[in-house]
Amino acid sequence: MRHRKSGRQLNRNSSHRKAMFSNMACSLVRHEIIKTTVPKAKELRRVVEPLITLAKTDSVANRRLAFARTRDNEVVAKLFTELGPRFAQRAGGYTRILKCGFRTGDKAPMAYIELVDRPEVEAAAE
């Protein structure tokens, strides 16, 4: 029975899940928008939102905690210099999930997960 067991298994063992969500969190922080399946996006929220909350108060201890969870100095620097100050006035809800159809190979439901208040990129086609 799976009573009171939170989180999705996603047909992976625990170390694979941990590595996958660490990599996805780094990609989301670096690019501010990524495309993935809907269940992975919903689980990724549970990893990224605490990281951004941690980055709102800049301290050595918080930077070490963020590095322990991401293992990437570039991502930690962006978290504490850009994202922490950007979301300083927002109490949670830093990500948005936008459904975008189905994958061609297996019809898996796909979604974009992005950081809210993301700076808009000017279209080069104009």
From Swiss-Prot:
The keyword Membrane does not apply. Pfam families: Ribosomal_L17. It comes from the Bacteria. One of its GO terms (molecular function) is structural constituent of ribosome. One of its GO terms (cellular component) is cytosolic large ribosomal subunit. Keywords: Ribonucleoprotein, Ribosomal protein. The keyword Aminoacyl-tRNA synthetase does not apply. GO terms for biological process: translation. Part of the 50S ribosomal subunit. Contacts protein L32. Belongs to the bacterial ribosomal protein bL17 family. NCBIfam families: L17. This is Large ribosomal subunit protein bL17. It comes from Aliivibrio salmonicida (strain LFI1238). The gene is rplQ.
